[in-house]
C-alpha cells in the first residue's frame, strides 16, 4: 500500500448533493481518516451548460453540514483543461492515440448497423491505422485512444471482486473532442493521477468506466489506483432510488430536521456493516471502517429507520447542543424564519430548561420545534380543536380555582406546583387527568406537550399565571 492514502470525492455540479453522493463522500472520508490520509474534493464541472454555481455551493454546504471536511483547496476540473489536452497530445505523439475523422453520419451508420445485428454500438476503428493525408477536408478530428484489441482488461475491485472485460468489446474511446475539449474519461484519469489519488471509491454505476480508464492509465504508463465500486442505494421496496424513496438533496434532510451525526450514522450502515452494531460515534466509524465489510448488494433506504435513528440521537444528545442545533438550523426548518425573531436569549434559556421533556417526544428537529411551540406562542393562545374540547365550563372552573393556589406558591418549581395540584385533586375528589389535561390545553393550546408541571416551571410565574387567567371560568 502507498505511504499515504489519498481518496477523492468528485461530484458533478449539475444538481444538489443527493443522498447517494453523500454516502460516497462519507465512505471516502472514513477510509482516508482511518488510514491517516487525505480526502480531496474535485468538482467535475467540464459540462459547462449544466454546471451551476448554485449546485457547487450546495455541494460544499452539504458536505460541511455533514461534517465531511475535505483536505486542501477544492479542485475544479474545468481549470485543468489545458493539462488534459496536453496529455491527449502526448498519447498521440507516442502512438497510443490517433486522429479520427469519422463524420457524425458515419458514426450513426455504425450505430444503426450494430442495432440491426443486435450488438452494442461501438466505433469500428476505421481511422486507427490510416494516414493523415487521407483526412477529408473541412472535418475537424477527434483524438481516440488506440486501445488493445486482444486479450482482457481485469480489475481487482475491493468490493466487486475480480471483474474482467474482453478487449474486443471495448472500442477506441474519444479522448479529445473535435472542439479540443477533453472527455470525462480522460479528465478523470489525468486528475486522479496528478492529485496522487491512491484509492478510488465510487458507485458501481461507474464500474463499466473502470475498464476504459484502466486502458488510459496503461497507455500513459501510469499505475492504476486501487478501485472499489460500492453498490447503489435503492428504496425500501427494492426499486431504484427516486425522490419518493429519499433521493433528495442533503439540504432537504436538514430541512426535515435530521441531525448530521444521525444521518452520517445511517448512511454508513447503508452497505457497510460491523456485526450487529447499529450506532456509531464518528470516532468509532473512523476506527472500524474498511472496504472488506462493504457488501455487493444494493442497500435499501428506509425513512422509518432513519427517523428512529435520529430519535435515538435526539434523546441522547446534550440539551445545550440541541438548542444550538435548533438555532443554527432554524432558517432551514418549516416556519423557522417566522420564529427566528422570537429566538431570543430568554427563549433559548426556556428551551434549554424544557429540552429534557421535549426531546423524549421528538424524532426530528421539526418535531422538537413543534413541541416547543408553546414557548413562542403569544397570548391569547390559539387553541386547537382538542384543546378547545378540553376547556369546557367544568375545566375552566378548576383552572379558576387553581390560579390563587398557584399565586401563593412559595417557589415556582415543577415539584411544588405538582404538589399543589395533587392536594387540590385530593380535596375535591376529581381525577388528576380532569385537571392536568385542561391545564395543558390552557398553557400550550394543545392536548399534548411535555410534562405539564415542567411546562409551568419553564413558562415562569408571570406567563404561566397569565395564560391560566385567560382560560379561567
Swiss-Prot record:
GO terms for molecular function: ATP binding; glutamate-tRNA ligase activity; tRNA binding; zinc ion binding. A motif ('HIGH' region) lies at residues 11-21. GO terms for biological process: glutamyl-tRNA aminoacylation. Residues 111-132 are annotated as: Disordered. Monomer. PANTHER family: GLUTAMATE--TRNA LIGASE, GLUTAMATE--TRNA LIGASE, MITOCHONDRIAL-RELATED. This is Glutamate--tRNA ligase 1.
Amino acid at each position: 500500500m502507498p505511504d499515504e492514502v489519498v481518496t477523492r470525492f468528485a461530484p458533478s455540479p449539475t444538481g444538489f448533493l443527493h443522498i447517494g453522493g453523500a454516502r460516497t463522500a462519507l465512505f471516502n472520508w472514513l477510509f482516508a481518516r482511518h488510514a491517516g490520509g487525505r480526502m480531496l474534493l474535485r468538482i467535475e464541472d467540464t459540462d459547462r451548460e449544466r454546471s451551476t454555481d448554485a449546485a457547487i455551493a450546495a455541494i460544499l454546504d452539504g458536505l460541511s453540514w455533514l461534517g465531511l471536511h475535505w483536505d486542501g483547496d477544492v479542485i475544479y476540473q474545468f481549470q485543468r483543461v489545458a493539462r488534459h489536452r496536453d496529455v491527449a497530445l502526448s498519447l498521440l505523439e507516442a502512438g497510443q492515440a490517433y486522429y479520427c475523422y469519422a463524420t457524425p453520419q458515419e458514426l450513426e451508420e455504425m450505430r444503426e448497423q450494430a442495432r440491426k445485428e443486435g450488438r452494442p454500438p461501438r466505433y469500428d476503428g476505421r481511422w486507427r491505422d490510416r494516414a493523415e493525408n487521407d483526412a477529408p477536408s473541412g472535418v475537424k478530428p477527434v483524438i481516440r485512444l488506440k486501445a488493445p484489441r486482444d486479450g482482457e482488461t481485469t480489475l481487482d475491485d475491493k468490493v466487486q471482486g475480480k471483474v474482467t472485460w474482453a478487449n474486443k468489446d471495448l472500442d477506441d474511446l474519444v479522448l479529445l473532442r473535435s472542439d479540443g475539449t477533453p472527455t470525462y474519461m480522460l479528465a478523470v484519469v489525468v486528475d486522479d493521477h496528478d492529485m496522487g489519488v491512491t484509492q478510488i471509491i465510487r458507485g458501481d454505476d461507474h464500474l463499466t468506466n473502470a475498464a476504459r480508464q484502466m486502458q488510459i492509465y496503461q497507455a500513459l504508463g501510469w499505475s492504476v489506483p486501487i478501485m472499489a465500486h460500492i453498490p447503489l442505494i435503492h428504496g425500501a421496496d427494492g426499486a431504484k432510488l427516486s425522490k419518493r424513496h429519499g433521493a433528495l438533496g442533503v439540504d432537504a434532510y436538514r430541512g426535515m430536521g435530521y441531525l448530521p451525526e444521525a444521518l452520517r450514522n445511517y448512511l454508513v450502515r447503508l452497505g457497510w456493516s460491523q456485526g450487529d452494531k447499529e450506532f456509531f460515534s464518528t470516532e468509532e466509524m473512523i476506527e472500524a471502517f474498511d472496504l472488506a465489510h462493504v457488501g455487493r448488494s444494493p442497500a435499501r433506504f428506509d425513512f422509518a429507520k432513519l427517523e428512529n435513528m435520529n430519535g435515538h440521537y435526539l434523546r441522547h444528545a446534550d440539551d445545550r447542543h440541541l438548542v444550538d442545533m435548533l438555532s443554527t438550523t432554524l432558517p432551514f426548518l418549516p416556519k423557522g424564519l417566522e420564529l427566528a425573531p422570537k429566538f431570543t436569549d430568554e427563549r433559548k434559556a426556556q428551551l434549554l430548561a424544557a429540552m429534557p421533556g421535549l426531546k423524549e417526544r421528538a424524532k426530528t428537529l421539526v418535531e422538537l420545534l413543534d413541541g416547543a411551540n408553546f414557548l413562542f406562542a403569544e397570548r391569547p393562545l390559539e387553541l386547537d380543536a382538542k384543546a378547545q374540547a378540553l376547556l369546557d365550563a367544568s375545566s375552566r372552573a378548576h383552572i379558576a380555582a387553581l390560579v390563587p393556589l398557584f399565586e401563593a406558591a412559595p417557589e415556582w418549581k415543577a415539584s411544588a406546583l405538582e404538589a399543589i395540584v395533587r392536594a387540590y385533586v385530593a380535596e375535591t375528589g376529581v381525577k388528576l387527568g380532569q385537571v392536568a389535561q385542561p391545564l395543558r390545553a390552557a398553557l400550550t393550546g394543545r392536548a399534548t406537550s411535555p410534562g405539564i408541571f415542567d411546562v409551568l416551571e419553564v413558562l415562569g410565574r408571570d406567563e404561566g399565571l397569565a395564560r391560566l387567567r385567560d382560560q379561567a371560568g
